[in-house]
Amino acid sequence: MTLLAHRHVVGGEDPRVAFYADALDLLAASDIPFLVGGTFAFARYTEIHRETKDLDIFVRRSDCTRTLRVFDDSGYRTELTYPHWLAKVRRGEDFMDVVFASGNGIAVVDDEWFTHAAESEVLGMRLRLCPPEEMIWSKAFVQERERFDGADVLHLLREAGKDLDWPRLLTRFGDHWPVLLSHLVLFGFVYPDRRDCVPFAVVDALTKRLAEQKQESANRICFGTLLSREQYLHDLASGYVDARLPPHGGMTPDDLRLWTDAIGKRT
């Protein structure tokens, strides 16, 4: 039984789903724009339904404080867990993530997330979902030892690839286009019968860029930290510059310390 398919269990309503529904009702009654992401949005685009232990809500960074205040005023517990990307709302053992960027600081929630949002029914309500392009963009960088979202990216490409706004997706990745290309290569390997889901012109353009790349011997920067907060710490200790810091990234030294100290803890 999945949360998406059933709101009720034997003997009454599932308390966790009731928490999600109450939280969504509260937000929907406010004037704060928000999007539903995570398992709910993933299921809408891929038809892959799986159990979830939390609810992911996406808001603009400028709306995070207002969002938490809505729940504070209604008796929920709130916290700004990681100031560069994540807050949480709790009631009892249940919680909701309030997301305004990605853990590496790259996928910041901006107006485009809302402009291109799709509508769907979530727990009986018509709500807006994170666009598939933004889901691919943010998930493509999640490559930890304990969590790799590559399969999610490939499933999104398989089911939504022909309808994606590819120019917009390429713009989202920007200078990080090799990350997108790596997933497109894997997609062709995993689904040889669905290669037409990815425009040939996109693959052709990216592979030409790859062929034109030259070694940058003087550029001692490690972009691996955009993919994993833990697996490239050795490289930083060896003198590489962390790509999450300006001018390449948007995190501060304090953000990095807090995010690194949380390694091994449940986010």
Regions found by a protein language model. Give the residues of each.
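Catalytic cores of NTP-dependent nucleotidyl/adenyl transfer enzymes across multiple folds
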Residues: L3, V108-T267
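Conserved catalytic core of two-metal-ion nucleotidyltransferases
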Residues: D72-E112
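Helical scaffold of the NTase/Pol beta-like nucleotidyltransferase catalytic core
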Residues: M1-V36
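N-terminal functional module detector in eukaryotic proteins
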Residues: G12-R16, L26-L27, V59-S62, T67-R77
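Short, hinge-like loop/turn segments at secondary-structure boundaries
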Residues: T52-D54, Y76, D97-V98, T115, ...
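Short aromatic/hydrophobic-glycine micro-motifs
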Residues: I32, Y76-R77, K162, Q215
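Catalytic metal-binding acidic patch
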Residues: G38-F71, P131, V153
